[in-house]
């Protein structure tokens, strides 16, 4: 039931473990933490590991620089913790490789996405369909994720931030995050009645939707630090 730390610091491990029966496993925390070269397909004949019982994946691929396996079809319905799951703590030396489609993951039970993609330089996938209703912390979620540039709105519906209390440095250093996608984020949250109040968020982008931003900083009492309105940016 417990695979936590199983290959932690196994710096040379890169074997095929695709056929494992993981149906009863509850804890995968730190499983491949600092497993620098591991990059195996965790599938058997097209079938991925059974992760339906897993409740925690915190630090699972922390500093697993080489890993870029297909984990698209994982069942994450029971997972509550994804804290620092794909974090590259060494700031890209070497850089994190993970950039797989995980848009279909069921994240309805997840309470922490803090530092999930911290310094995950390669990651740039659409995760707008995720259910974030239970999430409490998104602090540093994309901090240093220099490739990430996706809208966090799916079929006109924004992420539900009703229970989020901490978004500090969420997009700090996410330098690819465009004004267009930042505007989408501002607009969708300003027009979502579920959006929580008194949020602090840092974004390394300019905005052009001053109306939505003003609503969030005023009516919702958000404390937003960003690169300013594009209208005030001097041409180069």
List each model region and its residues.
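Negatively charged
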Residues: 1-236
